[in-house]
């Protein structure tokens, strides 16, 4: 895990859990890969940085802020695991709806952009505030990059994504 606060709160979230604090998510992922631990708890922002580049073989889900709020008021945390689906199943049942929506929207945006076939790398980040959905996407193609964003009603994610993808496609 990447936060001492998480280590201190971990036993309250999961009964009979022993936590080991580590400053490096890379080291935690190595331990997880080598079956030295059952899961990794980290900040959601850190998870997002690793999501597209380093975590191809891991399952993850978010812990809702209603049961796990660091004193610093930072973003909700996430649990990663490579083998123990029980951890993810448990977290999924209580997961924050907006976090799950954002993950699905990000994945859909990336998939729609990558289907074009000429992007080297595509990244997307969705956020929901009140009733507004904002999706940012950045594509990289050889020596060029393009960043665009689109906002709209949280109840119309397909429209927001379609408009964003159309905008990007028209610019490349």
Predicted regions mapped to residue ranges:
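Early extracytoplasmic/lumenal segment of secretory-pathway proteins
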Residues: 4
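Small-molecule-sensing regulatory modules
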Residues: 7-16, 20-172
């Amino acid at each position: 895990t990447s936060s001492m606060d998480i280590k201190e709160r971990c036993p309250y979230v999961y009964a009979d859990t022993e936590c080991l604090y580590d400053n490096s998510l890379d080291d935690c992922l190595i331990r997880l890969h080598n079956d030295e631990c059952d899961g990794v708890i980290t900040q959601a922002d850190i998870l997002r940085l690793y999501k597209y580049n380093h975590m191809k073989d891991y399952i993850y889900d978010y812990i809702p802020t209603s049961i796990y709020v660091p004193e610093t008021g930072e973003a909700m945390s996430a649990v990663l695991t490579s083998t123990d689906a029980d951890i993810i199943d448990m977290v999924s049942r209580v997961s924050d709806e907006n976090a799950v929506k954002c993950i699905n929207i990000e994945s859909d945006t990336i998939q729609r952009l990558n289907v074009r076939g000429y992007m080297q790398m595509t990244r997307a980040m969705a956020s929901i505030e009140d009733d507004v959905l904002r999706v940012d996407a950045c594509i990289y193609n050889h020596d060029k990059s393009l960043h665009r964003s689109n906002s709209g009603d949280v109840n119309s994610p397909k429209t927001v994504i379609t408009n964003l993808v159309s905008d990007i496609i028209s610019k490349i």
